[in-house]
A protein has these predicted regions:
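Active-site HxH/HxHxD metal-binding segment of metal-dependent hydrolases
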Residues: 1-99, 126-127
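Basic nucleic-acid-binding alpha-helical/helix-turn surface characteristic of O6-alkylguanine DNA
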Residues: 2-3, 167, 197
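Histidine-centered divalent metal-coordination motifs
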Residues: 8-14, 112, 172, 234, ...
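Residues at the C-terminal ends
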Residues: 23-24, 162, 240
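Residue-level detector of structured alpha->beta connecting loops
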Residues: 26, 164-165, 205
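Metallo-beta-lactamase
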Residues: 49, 72-88, 95-96, 102-194
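C-terminal regulatory/interaction regions
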Residues: 199-261
Length: 261
């Protein structure tokens, strides 16, 4: 018997079949909510002549965490399922399914998307966290503005690291034993990339394409387009932190010029 259909977020490889399964089974869909509104215009990518691989994305292809798994391929960047609306809305701590001896609760983890929801299973013996795309077993996660938010992503990673679950089950990649240690590495990796972006701005690199050419020099050119989205995500956080300024704009854009504060 299908009791509930748990949806982590509404990218096209996650939510589109949920309504069909709900109609076939009679079980409700459960999620944090529909896709968030785009908060601002991130502008057009200023690089127009470059090899492209539309099926691939590099959230940070140059320095992926080495343990416990090493990614073999770039992350697939999903399109958004803007038609998805859950039957039931769940937030952190809400019980979404339960029976004798086990319970599943929601854990809101914005960052990859604003509506990303993990699901925690506790059967009294093993604490399992279904992490969706928030923590993946084969690569780091795409954080692509405007719906993707690096500051929120880091905060959500810290929440997961502090839970001390026994195992994490991602939607991409193998199960992750000792997920807290794995997530600590993800946090360190992102903060190191943030430091590199800040150093690049302080060193006189003013545009995102310039930064990507330096920071991702060892990465295939067809991955530079998604890498620019990742650098933008870091710059959004640095601007909000007050360490970087956008020239002539209130919000960072792909085609903006940046300088140190």
């Amino acid at each position: 018997t299908v009791r509930a259909i748990l949806v982590t977020h509404c990218h096209a490889d996650h939510s589109p079949l949920a309504a069909w399964l709900s109609a076939a089974s009679g079980a409700p869909t459960v999620a944090f909510g529909p896709h968030g509104d785009d908060a601002w215009d991130i502008g057009e990518d200023p690089v127009v002549h470059e090899p492209e691989n539309d099926s691939a994305s590099a959230d940070d292809p140059a320095t992926e965490p080495a343990e416990p798994t090493e990614p073999a391929e770039p992350v697939v960047e999903e399109s958004t399922d803007r038609d998805f609306v859950p039957d039931l809305v769940a937030v952190t701590g809400d019980v979404v399914a339960a029976a004798d001896g086990w319970v599943i609760t929601g854990l809101h983890t914005p960052g990859h998307t604003s509506n990303h929801l993990c699901f925690a299973l506790d059967d009294g013996e093993v604490r399992t966290l279904f992490t969706g795309d928030h923590v993946m077993g084969w690569s780091t996660t795409v954080v692509s503005p405007p719906d993707g938010d690096m500051a929120a992503y880091l905060d959500s990673l810290r929440v997961v690291a502090g839970r001390r679950d026994d195992v994490a089950i991602p939607t991409h990649g193998p199960p992750i034993p000792n997920p807290s240690a794995f997530v600590d590495e993800l946090i360190a990796h992102r903060l190191e990339r943030e430091r590199q972006v800040l150093d690049a701005v302080r060193g006189g690199l003013a545009t995102i394409p310039e930064m990507v050419e330096v920071l991702y020099a060892a990465v295939r050119k067809e991955l530079h387009k998604p890498a620019r989205r990742s650098v933008l995500a870091h710059l959004v956080k640095l601007v909000d932190d007050g360490t970087v300024v956008v020239e002539g704009s209130t919000r960072p854009r792909l085609d903006a010029t940046f300088r140190p504060h």
